[in-house]
């Protein structure tokens, strides 16, 4: 088991915030490599809070092994990638630009402790967005990304109606 702090630092070395604006689609999602941003967030750093499960839609844009069903209105796909139709983008690169901008905002807001601004970002899945925030927060966030789990924890420690609270 790798030291968690070392793992955290290894991620930041691989994806420093200043490099995000130049992160290519292939660096973001690549099924053949274990060094893509998505792979790091979901798999390599799972000891820093898991976001396993669910579908790949959480990444906004992803390279697929099996093409999504044509009748799934949530997703648009080409011969290699799929992305959310809610982005209203025709090409994967246009969709990826939306995703990359959201990641940059999340990372910068996390460094500044702007948690409410992160909560307002809707381009990415909830758990995925908060895992990214944790990874750029200087470990100021709790590495639990499922809102329901955080609410249960808050109840346990005596907070009244945590579901009604904001970050």
Where do the protein language model's features map onto the residues?
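Short hydrophobic alpha-helical segments that form membrane-spanning helices or hydrophobic packing faces
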Residues: 129-135
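An N-terminal alpha-helical hairpin/helix-loop-helix interaction module that forms a charged
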Residues: 1-126, 137-167
């Amino acid at each position: 088991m790798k030291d968690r702090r070392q793992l955290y630092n290894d991620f930041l070395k691989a994806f420093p915030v200043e490099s995000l604006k130049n992160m290519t689609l292939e660096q973001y999602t690549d099924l053949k490599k274990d060094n893509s941003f998505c792979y790091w967030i979901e798999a390599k750093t799972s000891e820093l809070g898991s976001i396993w499960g669910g579908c790949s839609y959480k990444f906004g844009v992803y390279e697929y092994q099996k093409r999504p069903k044509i009748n799934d209105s949530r997703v648009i796909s080409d011969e290699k990638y799929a992305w959310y139709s809610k982005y209203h983008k025709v090409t994967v690169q246009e969709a990826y630009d939306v995703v990359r901008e959201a990641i940059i905002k999340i990372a910068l807001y996390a460094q500044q402790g702007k948690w409410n601004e992160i909560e307002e970002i809707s381009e990415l899945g909830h758990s995925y967005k908060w895992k990214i925030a944790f990874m750029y927060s200087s470990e100021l966030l709790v590495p639990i990304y499922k809102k329901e789990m955080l609410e249960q924890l808050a109840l346990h420690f005596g907070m009244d109606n945590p579901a009604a609270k904001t970050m």
